[in-house]
Amino acid sequence: MTDLSRRDLLAGAAGFLGGAALAGLPLAADGQGAAAPAAAGAAPAPPPPRPVAPLDATKMPGAPTAALGARSEYFAPTRIPNGTPVGSSRTPLQDLTGTITPSDLHFERHHAGIPTLDPERHTLTIHGLVDRPMSFTVDDIKRFPQITRTYFIECSGNGGAGYRDPKPDTTPQPLAGLFSTSEWTGVPLATLFREVGVKPDATWFLAEGGDACKLARSIPIAKAWDDAMIVWAQNGEPLRPAQGYPMRLLLPGFEGNSNVKWLRRLELGTKPWMTRWETSKYTDPLPDGTARIFTFEIDAKSVITSPCYPNTIPSHGWRSVNGLAWSGRGRITRVEVSVDGGTTWHDAELLNTPQPKSTVRFQYM
């Protein structure tokens, strides 16, 4: 396991540095916030009506209990969906605290919409270079010893828009919102591989999803023996359909597209399958016209979530700089923040214990 320090973090986080985030924020002479102007070329959305609260809540009974809890009417974070079956929705990072993303705000990325799968009929088949090909239902997998871990998942395209066309009126949501962190519960993939008996010459496995596009990725088998999981629960409840219900592959630190949702098949072999998802789709174009394939690990990144557009910075008093840092190559052990465009750097405080391939919340005062 590799620990990552300041230089490693900054190498992968240049587009999200503190100086860049603060430079475009206006100073408020009276210390009051300003309303957010509309994005360029878009009509301003009317503000939602403000909920009406009693003048004195101690003078009247409150709301009754309910079957499901709900957020306060005064706090209504939303994702940014594109509204098509082949699309995505982005997490409102600027509205959240801590490191865990609420399940209903976890980012989405789909290639053929969200399938409806019956957990009693859906199975995971493991075959190929194994001694005992087997199929498992979700209940079958739940019989094995389970583990719970906290990991982030990030789409490989996260941050692309911000790097290509940076704008001063960009919030963390469109800039870095294809990134979320959750507590995941499942079984180590190594446990299932031992159950089926992996043959010695198996060096790769193919993971295939059960959605309409049957997304499939080739993965080095070393990842299965390391920390890969088959998960069925997220943040204390079964996976939501958009996150792969009833089961998905979780590859900590690997690009989001390799964490195959609605997992239905694992095939073991001696070489990559060269599917269209790893040849024409998820590749890295190079200047010489060729493309790099099979890049898996997410490099160190960070994003400042507060202050951000459309916040204003008071002309007096304290204001903390708050954000998130993460890496798929180890744990974040140090974060530094610049408020002068990179001329000087200052240590930020880490607000939670760094964990491998997970997220750290930091602040600088």
What kind of feature is each model-predicted range?
Residues 41-365:
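Structured, non-membrane catalytic/scaffold regions adjacent to prosthetic-group chemistry
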Residues 14, 20-21, 31, 72:
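Prokaryotic Sec-type signal peptides and long signal-anchor helices
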Residues 15, 27-30, 98-101:
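Intrinsic disorder/low-complexity segments in short proteins, especially the signal peptide
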Residues 1-20:
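N-terminal secretory signal peptides and thylakoid transit peptides that target proteins
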Residues 16, 33, 37, 46-52:
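Intrinsically disordered, low-structural-confidence terminal and linker regions
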Residues 22-24, 195:
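Residues at alpha-helix termini
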Residues 24-42:
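Signal peptide processing junction and immediate N-terminal pro/mature segment
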